Amino acid sequence: MLSTQVRPLRADAKRNRELLLKVAVHAFSHKGPDVTLESIASEAGVGIGTLYRHFPTREALIEAAYRNELARLCAGVPELLRTMPADVALRTWMDRFIDYLATKRGMADALRMVIASGGNPHAQSRERLLEAVGSLLKAGADQGALRRDIDPADVMIGISGVSLAAGAPQQREQAGRLLDLLLDGLRYRPPDRRRRRAAQT
């Protein structure tokens, strides 16, 4: 019986794949969906045959590049929580989410090409993002830094709003200030005793 297991990529093949995805994201974001695959392969330092071995079609490369950005964003959460307080980890992740949204906008035409061909590059992306945000919020609440009544979807909408209002590269300083304001609204604050007593009388 033939094995159906997928063999892990060799180190050099894995490195080539990661290089191709990195170059592809930049190319599709800045040059549009019609950038030649030959130019992507050349910039990654591999032959066109290597590109096609990993990604048989243009659409496959676009979808893989987009999904790789999403995976990197979500997979980085445990390391952030391991190396810094949860509220700082959330603020750092917010910056990364802004970068991810900028990449997504830059790849909009390329992603539409994938969708037109029957693909669904956005499948399960919302669920993965909600899970990532939820992990950060829970850790923050457990550490006493963040409120427990926060819906991860509300945080995602808030960051997306910042990206829409100040998502241009020259607006990053303003975007940072807006994200600071958003995080401030998520912080846990002990009830004011005097206000609580007044409410009880």
Where are these regions (language model features)?
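Basic, helix-initiating cap at the start of DNA-binding domains
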Residues: 1-43, 60-63
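Short alpha-helical scaffolding segments that buttress acidic/His motifs in well-ordered protein cores
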Residues: 61, 94-97, 159, 182
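Short hydrophobic/aromatic patch on the recognition helix
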Residues: 45-55
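Short secondary-structure transition hinges
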Residues: 92, 98-135, 161-168
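Hydrophobic alpha-helical connector segments
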Residues: 64, 75-103, 121
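Amphipathic, non-transmembrane alpha-helical scaffold segments
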Residues: 13, 66, 70, 122-130
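C-terminal peripheral helix-coil segments that are non-catalytic and often amphipathic
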Residues: 1-5, 99, 127, 131, ...
